[in-house]
Amino acid sequence: MTPAITISGPTQGYWPTLITGTRAKRSRRIVGTALGLALTICLPTTSWAQGQDSATWSRDRQVIEALLPGFYSNANQAYFDGRRQVPQPQNRYNLSIEASAEPHVFNATRTSTEGAVISTQRWSLFDDDAKEAVRMEIDDTQAGSQCPVWWTRDAAQFSAAADADCAEDPGSPITLSLAQQQLWWGSRRNDSAIKFHRSRAFTCYADIPGVGGGRDEPYTRYDNLSLHDQGAETWFTDKDGRTLGLRLFNVDWPINNYEGYFTRDSLVIYVVEKFDDGTTKEHGYAFTLPEANRIGINLKWLLASCFMVSGKVDTPTL
C-alpha cells in the first residue's frame, strides 16, 4: 500500500497553488520512486519461484531416507516357508538399518537369529539426474564396493534394482522393495527375496500368580522385559527356578487356515517354558489386532502384559 502524502499547517488538506517547475519535477520523481518501491513490494513473488521445483526423485529420496531406519526380521517368512514345506526355505535373519551421522548415509547390518554378523554395509543415497532415480551406493565392510542400485517409486512402495551386467558379492542386494511395513531383499545367492517385516519394540511384565480384577493378593512381578513383535522372545527365572518366557509375533498370514475362509493377521503373545534338556513348552497364547500397541494374557497362575507405551506415562482418556 502506497503511503498517503499529508501536508501539515494552514494548507493541510490541499496542495499549494504554486510550485516551480524544478520543484514540481523533483516532487514527481520522489512520488514516482515511492510508488515504484511500493508496487515492487506488493507484487506477487511467483516469478521468483519459477524453476525451483525439485525433481521427483529428489523428493523420493527424502521419503526413502525416512522409511529406511528400523529393525527388521523375516521370522514370518521363515516360519511359513517351513510350514508350507517350500523346496528352498529362507533362513531366519535380522536386519538393522540406522542413520549415520553423515547426511544421506545409512548403516545396514544383517545378522543371524543368534546374533552373528553376516554383513555390514554402508548405504549412501544420491539424486541421479541422468537416470531420474535415487542412486544408492553400497560399500560392504568385508567385500568392498558393491553394485549400486537405483530407487524408483511404485504404487505405495519404492523399488530398487542394480544394472543387469553388474556382478559383485552374491549376497549383496541387487533388488530391494521398501514400504511402510516391509523391506524385501533380493540377491543372486537366493532365488527368492528375503521378506523382512519392520518390528515394533515392546516392554513386558509377568506376575506370578496371575492376580486380576484388582484383588488384594500377593504376587511377584518380573518386569522390564524387552522384545520386539517379529518372533522375539524374552526370558526370566521365577523364584521356584522355572525358566519362563514371553514371545510376540505379529503374524502376516500368506495362507488361510482352511479353504473358503480368510485368516486375518494378528498380534500374538505366547507364554513358553524352557526345560533343562533344552526343550520348550507353550502354555498358551492370546491374540488381538495386528496394529494394537498392547496385549495381555492371564493364565491364572501367570499374568503377562506387553505394551509400547507404559501406563505410567500414557495420556489419561475418558
Where are the regions that the model predicts?
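Short secondary-structure subsegments characteristic of cysteine-rich extracellular domains
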Residues: 87-101
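N-terminal secretory signal peptides that target proteins for export/translocation
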Residues: 1-27
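Short, flexible coil/linker elements and helix-boundary hinge sites characteristic
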Residues: 20, 43-44, 68-69, 94-95
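Calycin-type beta-barrel ligand-binding domains and close structural analogs
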Residues: 53, 57, 61-69, 73-82, ...
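Bacterial N-terminal signal peptides
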Residues: 34-44
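Boundary at the C-terminal end of the N-terminal hydrophobic targeting segment
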Residues: 47-51
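Intrinsically disordered, low-complexity Ser/Thr/Pro-rich tracts
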Residues: 12, 16, 82, 86-87
